[in-house]
From Swiss-Prot:
The entry's keywords: ATP synthesis, ATP-binding, Cell membrane, CF(1), Hydrogen ion transport, Ion transport, Membrane, Nucleotide-binding, Translocase, Transport
UniProt name for this protein: ATP synthase subunit beta
Domain of life: Bacteria
Organism, scientific name: Corynebacterium efficiens (strain DSM 44549 / YS-314 / AJ 12310 / JCM 11189 / NBRC 100395)
UniProt function note: Produces ATP from ADP in the presence of a proton gradient across the membrane. The catalytic sites are hosted primarily by the beta subunits.
GO cellular component: plasma membrane; proton-transporting ATP synthase complex
Main location: membrane
SUPFAM superfamilies in alphabetical order: C-terminal domain of alpha and beta subunits of F1 ATP synthase, N-terminal domain of alpha and beta subunits of F1 ATP synthase, P-loop containing nucleoside triphosphate hydrolases
Signal peptide as annotated in the record: none
Topology within the bilayer: Peripheral membrane protein
Amino acid sequence: MTTALTEQNAQQAATAGRVVRVIGAVVDVEFPRGELPALYNALTAEVTLESVAKTVVLEVAQHLGDNLIRTIAMAPTDGMVRGATVTDTGKPISVPVGDVVKGHVFNALGDCLDVPGLGRDGEQWGIHREPPSFDQLEGKTEILETGIKVIDLLTPYVKGGKIGLFGGAGVGKTVLIQEMITRIAREFSGTSVFAGVGERTREGTDLFLEMEEMGVLQDTALVFGQMDEPPGVRMRVALSGLTMAEYFRDVQNQDVLLFIDNIFRFTQAGSEVSTLLGRMPSAVGYQPTLADEMGVLQERITSTKGRSITSLQAVYVPADDYTDPAPATTFAHLDATTELDRSIASKGIYPAVNPLTSTSRILEPSIVGERHYEVSQRVIGILQKNKELQDIIAILGMDELSEEDKITVARARRLERFLGQNFFVAEKFTGLPGSYVPLADTIDAFERICNGDFDHYPEQAFNGLGGLDDVEAAYKKLTGK
C-alpha cells in the first residue's frame, strides 16, 4: 500500500453507504457516485442483535459496478439488515505495531484480547503492504544456528528463510515451536510473532499459558484467527502477524522469528472466500488465485540488509497427498522442510525429526562448508544403510549380517539416539535441563561417532542428551567408571 494511495483513501474517510444485500459472510454495499472505497479498505457497520450493539468490520473485495461493492465480513453478520449504514474508514485493516504488542494476544483486526483497547492510540500499520524492493534484499546466505543438533547438522535453517514443519498430532510439533521461541528469546534476545491461522482455540490458550510459565511471553506477540471465525478473518490473520513482524525488522532492526500455524488453513480460507465471491474454482476446488495469494504472503517474509524475518510454518498435508495444490504451492517457497515422524517419536526420540526426509537448500559445501557437508552426508548414509538392512534383520536376525553391516547398524542406533535432545520447554516433563549445542561441537560429535570412537559405549549413553560431555557423564554413570 503506497503512501500516496493511503493519503487518498484517508481523504475519503467517513463516506457512508448502505447495505443492499447480505448472504452470510458476503455483504454488498451501495455508495454515492464517485465515492467508492478502494479495494481492501476496511468498512464498519453498527449491528444490534438481541439489544446488544456491536461493530462489524467489512473488507472491500470487489467493485461490481453501478456504485456497488462486494465485501467480506470479518465477524458474523447476524443482525445485519438491508439499509444499514456502512462507513468507509479510508484505510485498510490496521494493527498496532512496536513494543506495545509484545506479551499480548491480538485478533486479525488488531484488537487486543487480553487488554481491550491496548495499542489503538499508538502507531498502526495497514496489513496490505508491498514486499521489500530488490535493492533492500540481503544478498548473502547465513545459517540460523538453533543449538538443536538434528536441525543444525542435517536440515540447517536459513536466516530470513522459510521453513516448513510437517507433523501429525502428538509428534511434538507444538513443543518444537515453543522451543524455537524460547531459544530465539534466550540466545539472540530476539522477538517472535506467532500467527494462529484457523486452528483450535484450546491450542492457542495452552500456548499462551505455557509461554507465560516459561518466561518468554514478554518477547512474543500472538495473533489469532481461530477455526470458529469467518473465512475473511482466517485469510487475513497471517498478514496481521506478518505486519507486526515487519515493524520489528524494518524500524527496530531486529531479527524476527515468525510462526504460522497452520499455513494450509490460510489456503483453505482463501478457497472459501473465493467461492463466496463467485470465482470459478481451479484444480481440486481451490481458488484460481492460489499461487498469487501465497506469493503475496511469502514474498514479504525475507531478509533485508542487516535484519531478517525467519518463518517457521506448520504445513498440513491433506490425506498425506503431497501433490495436492495447497502444499505443492507452499513447497515452492520453502528453504527447508522439517518432517516429524511418528515412528521416531514412538522410540522416545525427541525432536522426532526424520533426517532422511527432511531437507534444506543450503546443505551444500559452498554455504555450510566442506566438513559440515561431509559429516552430514556420512550420518545420512549410515542411517539410510540401516534402514535398508531392517528387512533383513526382521526376517533373518542380526546374526546373518556381515561384520561391516553389524557395525553400521550399531552406529546408526547410536546416531539415532544422539539426534534426540533435551529441550528447555520439556524440563518439567523429562526432569532433564535443556541444552544448547554449538554447531562446531555438533559437527565434531557426529564425526567422532561415525569414526567409531564411541562404538564401545552402550546405546543408553546417547539418549536425549546435549553434547559429548553429557554422553561421557552418562557413560560413567552407566558403567560406574
